[in-house]
Amino acid sequence: MDKLTAMATFVKVVDAGSFTRAADALGLPKARVSQRVSDLEKHLGVRLLNRTTRALSLTHDGSAYFDKCQVLLQQIDELEATLRGGTATPIGRLRVDSLITIARWVIAPRLHDFQARYPRIQLRLSSSDRISNLLEDGIDCTIRGGALKDSSMIARHLCDIQMGLYASPEYLASIGGVDSPNDLSQFRRLSWFSGRERNPFMWELESGPERFVVQSGDGMQFDEPDVAISACMAGSGICPGAPFAVAGFVRAGKLVPVLPQWHFSAAPVHVIYPGSRHLSVRVRCFVNWVMELFAENPEIQLTPIALALESGLAQRT
């Protein structure tokens, strides 16, 4: 048995979702494709696929083996491309995890550019606000806020986000406005929780040298910031938000800055990937692309006060 051929056939079967489609893609009889996978299972001594008359699914062992096969086959492709042409052609799957707000408002709108540059990279983008373990979760690189805690990883700085507070015009009219941070505890507050510990987001505001902590209350909490913003626009209360994410709503009159001279501490955002001399070409291409994307988009660095001044909504100081 040619192990590399068997591994490549197994990966093709999983990608295609059936032996028939894999056989068509490979230009082989279905029986030969099925036999290759069976021989591989016999060689390994484990079942890789659950087979039914209607569908195929990976076993637990099969899932782990599939991930390793992909990495190995992609490394072989890159090595051969380097030897043939001097420069490795980025090819294969790339698994990226990102903060939800960054994924929605910064990365997704520009993915057509990444696809045009690297048409052979198959990007799988997941978005969440929990802390990912790259190795355990099978992720190639991640975009995260806050300080880097794992010294085995490399973090490249992308930007600093300074969040502010926002509310719908209708809600502000109903409460008569907000004149100082002391007023915030009287009104409905929307926030979110994230991370493995599901800790709530703390309202710790600053304005120059001044600091103010809004005491926790009974406001609603969400596990996605964008959902909280949607509730905010519907008049449910006052909500934190990244200026670049809410700028369109502010300019359209759907949201109004609240105390724009007060803001949350600037949070650094990094693209993080394993520290390895053998970093794949795919990861290197994505890291360079995303750093270029952030550098060319000044609105990502927009501050609450700048957005309010731009919109003519910075009356309350």
From Swiss-Prot:
Stored Pfam families:
HTH_1, LysR_substrate
Q: Does the keyword Metal-binding apply?
A: no
- Domain HTH lysR-type positions: 1-59
Molecular function (Gene Ontology), one example:
DNA-binding transcription factor activity
Superkingdom as given in the UniProt entry: Bacteria
Loss of function: phenotype: Inactivation of this gene produces a 3.4-fold increase in the expression of fldP in cells untreated by H(2)O(2).
Stated family: Belongs to the LysR transcriptional regulatory family.
Its biological purpose: Represses the transcription of the operon that consists of PA14_22510 to PA14_22540.
Q: What is this protein called?
A: HTH-type transcriptional repressor PA14_22550
Q: What broad taxonomic lineage does this protein's source fall under?
A: Bacteria, Pseudomonadati, Pseudomonadota, Gammaproteobacteria, Pseudomonadales
